[in-house]
Amino acid sequence: MKFFNREKEINEILLILEEEPNNIYFIYGPLNSGKSTLIREVITNRLDKSKYIPFFIDFRTRNILNVDNFIECLFEVDEKSKIDDFREYAKSLADLLVKGSEEISKYYLGMPIKVPKPFFDRIFSKRDKSADVYQYIEYLFAKLNEKGKKPILIFDELQMIREITLNGNRLLLWSLFQFLVALTKVQHLCHVFCLSSDSLFIEYIYGKAELKGGVDYILVDDFDKKTALKFMDFLAKQKNINLTNEDKELIYSYVGGKAKYIYDVIVKLKAVKDLKYILETKLEEERNHLEELLEKVEEDYEGINYDEVLEALKLFKDNYELPKSKIKRKIRIFLIKENILFLNPQKGTLKPQSYLVWNAIKRML
């Protein structure tokens, strides 16, 4: 599927890249709102490759239980290299990256950070591994800057390392943040973007005083109604499907502006033809999920009070968005963790993760 819209967010990111690095940027939003698709579009189609080199670290599909797993995710080992001095290797890697895009073009979104095997093995022989890791990345990025290339470091689903500690006490996440602040705000060596669908994690970051002045946020929300209807036209043309204005209004009334759901509905429409049936099926699936969750709560799931959950959900019968203070902290955290509600920490508001969830709440209650 061709990329659609998001020009506002794309232009914001491109303007950030034109300036000297000064912040860690958190790209966040509801589930399936298009965060990864957005950064993919920027990196693959909008980026001036003569100026930038993207590095992409994907925590989404990795089981990261300790610092060793983190390092394995961070680096790609050059098994053929016998170079023991990381500075020598970093210089040669920087030369390779600057001379041509052949090495980069192998990677769809951005390359991992390559290290020579002797250096990688030496890291794992030490108790405190983070110092060597950070020193190598800093040196590599400094060399790229010297050659006129600005690195872009992207972390997908960074919250996956939230609980990992260094040597049993200090959190890896805060060690990493200190390093990233040094790379951006202090040394201006690289741009950093962190993607996350976990709004509790974003709230956690947002509330940390030590990060203020060193981080900023980009919200990738579901489409507004006008954009959602245009997206339906865009897809209908691609899929050679005739959608009436009534059809589009009906789709929006069920799934709102969530691009993934709109896409799923229109793709199914090619085979099923019955739009109302498709939408009702999706809604019933969501309602069943909510009903199952409430049944577990009624049986004392995680010590959550059933009546308090019901009262919280009832607040959304006539409201799509509410101040987070309207719902007790314990209850809202539970509903956010269960992907029923989405928290916007910048506005201090809560809303259902999607129109589909909102409709399921209203239908159940």
UniProtKB/Swiss-Prot annotation:
<dbReference type="InterPro" id="IPR036388">
    <property type="entry name" value="WH-like_DNA-bd_sf"/>
</dbReference>
<dbReference type="Pfam" id="PF21690">
    <property type="entry name" value="MJ1010-like_2nd"/>
</dbReference>
<dbReference type="InterPro" id="IPR049081">
    <property type="entry name" value="MJ1010-like_2nd"/>
</dbReference>
<dbReference type="GO" id="GO:0005524">
    <property type="term" value="F:ATP binding"/>
</dbReference>
<dbReference type="Pfam" id="PF01637">
    <property type="entry name" value="ATPase_2"/>
</dbReference>
<dbReference type="InterPro" id="IPR027417">
    <property type="entry name" value="P-loop_NTPase"/>
</dbReference>
<keyword id="KW-0547">Nucleotide-binding</keyword>
<comment type="similarity">
    <text>Belongs to the archaeal ATPase family.</text>
</comment>
<feature type="binding site">
    <location>
        <begin position="29"/>
        <end position="36"/>
    </location>
    <ligand>
        <name>ATP</name>
    </ligand>
</feature>
<dbReference type="InterPro" id="IPR011579">
    <property type="entry name" value="ATPase_dom"/>
</dbReference>
<keyword id="KW-0614">Plasmid</keyword>
<keyword id="KW-0067">ATP-binding</keyword>
<protein>
    <recommendedName>
        <fullName>Uncharacterized ATP-binding protein MJECL15</fullName>
    </recommendedName>
</protein>
